Amino acid sequence: MATKLIKHGSKAREQMLEGIDILADAVKVTLGPKGRNVLIEQSFGSPKITKDGVTVAKSIELKDKIRNAGAQLLKSAATKAAEVAGDGTTTATVLARALAREGNKLVAAGYNPMDLKRGMDLAVNAVVEEIKKSSKKINSQEEIAQVGTISSNGDKEIGEKIAKAMEEVGKEGVITVEEAKNFSFDVEVVKGMMFDRGYLSPYFVTNSEKMVAELENPFILLFEKKLSNLQPMLPILEAVVQSQRPLLIIAEDVEGEALATLVVNRLRGGLKVAAVKAPGFGDRRKAMMEDIAILTKGELITEDLGMKLENVSIKSLGTAKRVTISKENTVIVDGNGDKKNIEDRVLQIKSQIAETTSDYDKEKLQERLAKLSGGVAVLKVGGATEVEVKERKDRVEDALAATRAAVE
């Protein structure tokens, strides 16, 4: 069993404060729009340049156990600020250090620590109320850009790109940040629903130059289980062939004989078809397939409700204006779902977001909400070197989190 180092009283507090000071001094230089960058050595690859307080805090581990305990205590304040607001981590660190320092002085002077804690709670509540009174709603695109600019260390381009992305997909839309393969910084907007599953066979590709399968005005079959035999599907396949429209199959998986038969039909030109795996896992996969069904005005074929493939009619299939499938992603554009049904589904997901206590579940529900209600915007961050790209990407992520918090 590992031995424990036990210390009491003022000496222990002083050593913990030394650890708090070491971490706070490293973090505080990044404070505000005029804050400076910090260079962090990494165990592999190039050094990391960042102006993000929590990134600096997370990189610090002290050899002395008591000092390190103080540093970790302060680190938890920065981490919590990052989780809740996504930004303001340096401010949280500086304030937490001040509370610890001044609190220690009063404890040393004989004040009751619990009375001090109660006083701090009262002060926090009073300050929060005053901040709420002086706050203002962020509505216009110009104001959104200003928040992003300030949070990104005065980079106007970052602020403007975030504002543009929010305008395109809405304040609740999915906005992701990726590294670009060139020098530019662009906003790429995908209208409709995108999920991270690509075609199950490259033989489904219709555009060999772009290596994508493009289906115009397709029917969409949603099946909850695996497809390994197409025999039960023959009636619906014949109906689709007669309609002379393409077919997209979304199922848990399409394998073996079923996949081979679809590929052969595709190559012979008898049926314009593509198959993809359903997004997500378990209950979340079923919920996402139900989302797609509502978006495309189709039905999720599930055996739990006694539905069988051989009994499916063409009326049970969803439809969309266009579907584009790459090796990694599927995009359903302009689904023909009923607007009222989509709005009801959006309200249902919002209700689930309000009720859940899990951060992970909340994030996944918000992704589903955005896919249904808006679209997907990708901020592609480029630069001359890997270090520059990563530093700018960090600032974009910080600015995006701050802007999201501002428009809530």
Swiss-Prot record:
GO cellular component term of the entry, any: cytoplasm
Keywords for the protein's UniProt record, in alphabetical order: ATP-binding, Chaperone, Cytoplasm, Isomerase, Nucleotide-binding
* Pfam families according to UniProt: Cpn60_TCP1
Give the Enzyme Commission number: 5.6.1.7
The record ties this protein, via Gene3D superfamilies, to: GroEL (3.50.7.10), GroEL-like equatorial domain (1.10.560.10), TCP-1-like chaperonin intermediate domain (3.30.260.10)
List where the protein spans the membrane: none
What's an example of a GO molecular-function annotation for this chain?
ATP-dependent protein folding chaperone
Q: What class of enzyme is it?
A: isomerase
Q: What is its main location?
A: cytoplasm
Question: What's the superkingdom here?
Answer: Bacteria
Q: Which reaction does this enzyme catalyse, per its entry?
A: ATP + H2O + a folded polypeptide = ADP + phosphate + an unfolded polypeptide
**GO terms for biological process, alphabetical:** protein refolding
Where are the disulfide bridges?
none
Q: Which cellular compartments is it found in?
A: Cytoplasm
Q: Which residues bind ATP?
A: T30, L31, G32, P33, K51, D87, G88, T89, T90, T91
Family membership, please give it: Belongs to the chaperonin (HSP60) family.
Summarize the subunit comment: Forms a cylinder of 14 subunits composed of two heptameric rings stacked back-to-back. Interacts with the co-chaperonin GroES.
Q: What does this protein do?
A: Together with its co-chaperonin GroES, plays an essential role in assisting protein folding. The GroEL-GroES system forms a nano-cage that allows encapsulation of the non-native substrate proteins and provides a physical environment optimized to promote and accelerate protein folding.
Q: What is this protein called?
A: Chaperonin GroEL
Species of provenance: Rickettsia rickettsii
The uppermost taxa in this organism's lineage are:
Bacteria, Pseudomonadati, Pseudomonadota, Alphaproteobacteria, Rickettsiales
